[in-house]
Curated annotation (Swiss-Prot):
Residues 1-35, 448-467 are annotated as: Disordered. SUPFAM superfamilies: Cysteine proteinases. It is found in: Cytoplasm. The active site is at 170 (nucleophile), 364, 366. Its EC number is 3.4.22.-. Keywords: Autophagy, Cytoplasm, Hydrolase, Protease, Protein transport, Thiol protease, Transport, Ubl conjugation pathway. This is Cysteine protease ATG4a. Belongs to the peptidase C54 family. GO terms for cellular component: cytoplasm. It comes from the Eukaryota. One of its GO terms (molecular function) is protein-phosphatidylethanolamide deconjugating activity. Interacts with ATG8. InterPro entries: Papain-like_cys_pep_sf, Peptidase_C54, Peptidase_C54_cat.
Length: 467
């Protein structure tokens, strides 16, 4: 069945060209007193991108008319077209995602990026060299995250004429980013960053299955096929719950086709939901017994524990995220197991990879790029379209309440550490946990019975809708 969260979103999402990505973007937000801007001139040169400009997506023209303008007039016309296109795209993005906020919203608060803390300080006593080192490390880390965007020019989907996912594929692309990041963590570790020289084979092997064709294991084509029973279809937007289930189905299919030692996705996929198939209200429950079962199924009974990715689809309110959940959302990025959040504005999904205070830093899939074929046999392939240098942020309170958390646990010790952190987070949530943790289904049933006459439980669940 479809999640309740999916009813909040329209059927299409929006697109933009790459020109927005290639604008200069200061690390510090433009808002704030002017003396702060002059004081921290170092920050203005970080997170800038190349100066190339690309046009917004459109079908190629079949016209064969020759150019008749002079070089000067041709350049003038080109500048006018770029200016008009950039302005239209900027206004369009502001309507969908809100004002284009770039850089760092604060010069003093720590930044958390998928479990790693960057201590940003603007104190008089802090040296500029130290600040510059931190900013450079943050820039390198962010720009090393995998970006998946709209693509054009791939083979049509089955029984359709779609050769691009423009205007509807953003949630699928966001989910591809999350899984690609989990694979990078698995193969190369959290400390890995993109090198300027030829890429590592493990890096290329990570990108290869996300190609835009059916032979690619995690392509948009195969996700749509795997998620058909959850409403995935070419041309239609999809919500967080449905895409999580699509990944679960795709992982199960690939597991059955391949032996455990040669899995394209070398980890179990486990979705955290409510007890008794969601019949009880309240926060979703991570049952350790069920997670262990997922690992056993993935290894086909050969191992009691394997790497695992946990997906937690949530609905944190009605029209917007209830503010009482925001501190917990922020805290999840301090977990070393965090692989981010699938979320954004209604009908416009993004991949949130970090936070500063109550702002979320995200990678935006709403850019249209040509299909690129990446594999380990072509180490010199240009993979720049899979990365972004522009740090964008969105207030967490403005997110659509339908979202999904992601966590990757490398082994049993890592999973145990995650459970301890999750339990502590639930205890400190003031009665509004994102999700809870229990050992067995017996404990869940006892909890259900114990809460039967508890008025505070009803109050705690007012904003919850189970998936």
């Amino acid at each position: 069945m479809k999640a309740l969260c999916d009813r909040f979103v329209p059927q299409q999402c929006s697109s933009s060209s790459k020109s927005d990505t290639h604008d200069k973007s200061p690390l510090v937000s433009d808002s704030g007193p002017s003396d702060n801007k002059s004081k921290f001139t170092l920050w203005s040169n970080v997170f800038t991108s190349s100066s190339s400009v690309s046009q917004p997506y459109r079908e190629s023209s079949t016209s064969g008319h020759k150019q008749v303008c002079t070089t000067r007039n041709g350049w003038t016309a080109f500048v006018k077209r770029v200016s008009m296109a950039s302005g239209a795209i900027r206004r369009f993005q502001e309507r969908v995602l809100g004002p284009n906020r770039t850089g760092l919203p604060s010069t003093t608060s720590d930044v958390w990026l998928l479990g790693v803390c960057y201590k940003i300080s603007a104190d008089e006593n802090s040296g500029e060299t130290d600040t510059g080192t931190v900013l450079a490390a943050l820039q390198l880390d962010f720009s090393s995250k995998i970006l998946m965007t709209y693509r054009k020019g791939f083979e049509p989907f089955r029984d359709t004429t779609y050769t691009s996912d423009v205007n509807w594929g953003c949630m699928i692309r966001s989910s591809q980013m999350l899984f690609a990041q989990a694979l990078l963590f698995h193969r190369l570790g959290r400390a890995w960053t993109k090198k300027s020289e030829l890429p590592e084979q493990e890096y290329l092997e990570t990108l290869e299955p996300f190609g835009d064709s059916e032979p690619s294991a995690f392509s948009i084509h195969n996700l749509i096929i795997a998620g058909a029973s959850y409403g995935l279809a070419a041309g239609s937007w999809v919500g967080p719950y449905a895409i999580c289930r699509a990944w679960e189905s795709l992982a199960c299919k690939k597991r059955k086709q391949t032996d455990s030692k040669n899995q394209t996705l070398p980890m179990a996929v486990h979705i955290v939901s409510g007890s008794e198939d969601g019949e009880r209200g309240g926060a979703p429950i991570l049952c350790i017994e069920d997670a262990t079962k997922s690992c056993l199924e993935f290894s086909k009974g050969q191992s009691e524990w394997t790497p695992i990715i946990l997906l937690v689809p949530l609905v944190l309110g009605l029209d917007s995220v209830n503010p009482r959940y925001i501190p917990s959302l922020v805290a999840t990025f301090t977990f070393p197991q965090s692989v981010g959040i699938l979320g954004g504005k209604p009908g416009a999904s993004t991949y949130i990879v970090g936070v500063q205070e109550d702002k979320g830093f995200y990678l935006d899939p709403h850019e249209v790029q040509q299909v690129v074929t990446v594999n380990k046999e072509t180490p010199d392939v240009d993979t720049s379209s899979y990365h972004c240098n522009v740090l964008r942020y969105v207030p967490l309170e403005s997110l659509d309440p339908s979202l999904a958390l992601g966590f990757y646990c490398r082994d049993k010790d890592d999973f145990d550490d995650f459970c301890l952190r999750a339990l502590k987070l639930a205890e400190e949530s003031n009665g509004a946990p994102l999700f809870t943790v229990t050992q067995t289904h017996t404990a869940i049933n006892q909890s259900n019975y114990g809460f039967a006459d508890d008025d505070s439980e009803d109050e705690r669940e007012d904003d919850w809708q189970m998936l």
